[in-house]
Amino acid sequence: VGAGNTPAIIDDSADIVLAVSSIIHSKTFDNGMICASEQSVIVLDKVYDAVKAEFAARGCYFLDPFETERVRKTIIINGALNAKIVGQKAATIAALAGVKVPEGTKILIGEVESVELSEEFAHEKLSPVLAMYRAADIEDAFSKAEHLIADGGYGHTSSIYLDPVKEKAKLDEFAGRMKTCRILVNTPSSQGGIGDIYNFMLTPSLTLGCGSWGGNSVSENVGVKHLINV
């Protein structure tokens, strides 16, 4: 197993309502504790405003620049995840940062630009906190996703929302470029990554192998067969 700094790309061919509702469903499950949950959303410029509006309409809170700075200094301290935010509600995390949000806020979203580790929002956060990036085009989106995976998610999970029929070439390139053992398409990444309900292609498990990319001997979801000596 390993860290899962999961990026989710929303292509301009995506069903925006499906994408946003899936990400919220995933990120609020167990308050973002599942390591396959989305840590960053990368949205193509053409649909960025529509995606932002959909997140806001569904109870997510977009931090202004001042609030973003307060939250970034709360989620990561001295280069490490602040244990006080792990699995907490969005409103609780906001309060820790001195930011006031509606009590029912589902996710805190920081609109950021850098994918470097110097950007706190680019880290794995294990809480209902998301980074949101604007991508100029699909190549820019792929590049950002690759960088975020390199920041701390090699071998784990990556996700994309698009029309898989019309944009098969994009999907094939995404699958080929992302160094993750789970490639999820139009699927909530928490539930899709752990298998079963949303993804019958994966063995149900909360222990997710990251393969040689993540320094693991197993690349699939770990089950009882991996505990048997043969």
Model-inferred region functions:
Residues V99-V230:
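Conserved C-terminal structural/oligomerization subdomain of aldehyde/semialdehyde dehydrogenase
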Residues V1-E116:
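ALDH superfamily catalytic-core signature
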